[in-house]
Swiss-Prot record:
This is Uncharacterized oxidoreductase C663.06c. It comes from Schizosaccharomyces pombe (strain 972 / ATCC 24843). GO terms for molecular function: oxidoreductase activity. The keyword Cytoplasm applies. Belongs to the short-chain dehydrogenases/reductases (SDR) family. NADP(+) binds at residues 17, 36, 62, 89, 158, 162, 191, 193. The keyword RNA-binding does not apply. GO terms for biological process: cellular detoxification of aldehyde. The lineage of its organism: Eukaryota, Fungi, Dikarya, Ascomycota, Taphrinomycotina. The active site is at 158 (proton donor), 162 (lowers pka of active site tyr). Keywords: Cytoplasm, NADP, Nucleus, Oxidoreductase. One of its GO terms (cellular component) is nucleus. It is found in: Cytoplasm; Nucleus. It comes from the Eukaryota.
Length: 253
């Protein structure tokens, strides 16, 4: 496999926004995409896509496990020896209760997957990204994790985990600022995915108007992916540490 290609690793590339990223990137000339799935055998749509796109390679990865992240990185290292763009898109979203009524297991599961998970991927893939030409690391975050643009719905564990992820991104951007890296978080917008629909249904009990807003304004995953890629394609060194919206504007922390 040629190392002159631009190499992308998409953690969580098996469905929704991640799969849309994989599809758009794999249609680009000179691009190789490694897409992770926790259970590759169950990622049927990604499997089908890879059969018709020889530049797509599926990697097993459970981001909650540092061992799994290290194994995934070793597999990519053997194949291509570098990563130009590391995009951590994996995460969970099933926390819709008040802080008062959110149990420990919900807090713990969101922190483990949405914060420690991306940290595991970063720790495992850092040497590969350092060898890449672009040296870009992207964390898919959420407006819900912004305290400056507070989202007025009960998000408890999810919102807290995304705020922690944004802090982690900012810390990494500071640590790598002298190594030529560009590290950002990005909000994909309100996207028509299964997890987003579940969240809307939960919040509709208290605010029924959200159903109409979601129906009219939610982006298709392909549109969100396309918009975010425009942002990432045009990143400059001075963007290191930014929290972007999918449309290229910035979001306060």
């Amino acid at each position: 496999m040629s190392t002159t290609n631009k190499i992308y690793f998409i953690a969580g590339g098996n469905r929704g926004i991640g799969l849309s990223l994989v599809k758009e990137l794999s249609n680009r000339e000179g691009t190789v995409v490694f897409a992770s799935a926790r259970k590759p055998e169950a990622a049927t749509e990604l499997q089908e896509w890879s059969k018709s796109h020889s530049n797509v390679h599926i990697i097993k990865l459970d981001i909650s496990s540092l061992e799994s992240a290290n194994e995934a990185a070793q597999e990519v290292a053997k194949a291509v020896g570098k990563v130009d763009v590391l995009w951590v898109n994996s995460g969970i979203f099933h926390s819709f209760n008040t802080v008062l009524n959110t149990p420990d297991d919900v807090w713990n599961s969101h922190y483990k997957t949405n914060v420690l998970g991306p940290i595991h991927v970063y720790q495992a893939f850092y040497p590969l990204v350092k060898k890449g030409e672009s040296k870009i690391i992207v964390f898919t975050s959420s407006l819900v994790g912004s305290m400056g643009a507070f989202f007025p719905f009960n998000q408890s564990g999810y919102g807290q985990s995304k705020a922690a992820l944004n802090f982690t991104m900012k810390e990494i951007s500071f640590e790598l600022q002298d190594e030529g890296f560009i590290v950002i978080s990005i909000h994909p917008g309100m996207v028509r995915t299964d997890s987003a629909q579940e969240a809307v249904n939960q919040h509709a009990e208290a605010k029924p108007e959200i159903l109409d807003i979601f129906a009219k304004q939610a982006l298709a995953p392909d549109q969100s992916a396309s918009d975010m890629l425009k942002v990432v394609d045009n990143l400059k060194p001075e963007n290191n540490g930014f929290f972007f919206n999918y449309d290229g504007t910035t979001i306060p922390y």
